[in-house]
Amino acid sequence: MYRVLLAPGAKQELRNAIAYIKRKLRNPIAVARLADEAKTTLRNLRSMPERHPFCDDPVLRLQGYRHAPVTKYQFIFRITKTPNQVRVLHFFHETQDYLVTLQMESPGP
């Protein structure tokens, strides 16, 4: 079993996505669906984080970044084995270029 840690930035990005759908799109069904699927995905990361693929970018792949889909969004995370942790770093919409953000944060291979 893995311990799932949601970074403050990822929490805020998830909150922002929910607020956008609620206030701008005025779609309570989509809000509930996103919240439910996000919770389910985070819960599933506790037992099977390796089932999610590595990011497509070769540099990010070498650094162990993976992504887990949540409706039209995705959690970006890394797995550590000692201790068994999943660190969820970001929550991006599918249209966002997450590569730029992650490469700027990345310490290198």
Regions inferred by a protein language model and the residue ranges of each:
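Basic, Lys/Arg-enriched alpha-helical interface segments
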Residues: 1-64, 107-109
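Enriched for short, Lys/Arg-rich terminal
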Residues: 70-74, 78-109
